């Protein structure tokens, strides 16, 4: 009984496309920009190998901003898929 209810609620799978990749990249850029403005200690240890390339971020700040960017991106992509845009 529970299995049939779960199968009835399942949506169609989302196919990857370049549009989805672009949305994820834009979401990560927005998150990194937001993190650059709001993180109190962006250059906390451990440092990254090329600090200038990563905008002066340490490993914790880079991981935090990209994780936040992926959460934003997934929310945008799944929200648009739920609305029928993809």
From Swiss-Prot:
GO biological process: photosynthesis
Domain of life the protein comes from: Bacteria
Localization terms from the record: Cellular thylakoid membrane
Membrane topology of the entry: Multi-pass membrane protein
Keywords carried by this UniProt record: Membrane, Photosynthesis, Photosystem I, Thylakoid, Transmembrane, Transmembrane helix
Keyword presence, rRNA-binding: no
Organism: Trichormus variabilis (strain ATCC 29413 / PCC 7937) (Anabaena variabilis)
GO cellular component: photosystem I; plasma membrane-derived thylakoid membrane
Propiece span(s): 1-8
Protein name (Swiss-Prot/TrEMBL): Photosystem I reaction center subunit PsaK
Membrane spanning residue stretches: 14-34, 60-80
Gene3D superfamilies reported for this sequence: Photosystem I PsaK, reaction centre
Primary localization: membrane
InterPro entries: PSI_centre_PsaK_sf, PSI_PsaG/PsaK, PSI_PsaK, PSI_PsaK_bact
Family: Belongs to the PsaG/PsaK family.
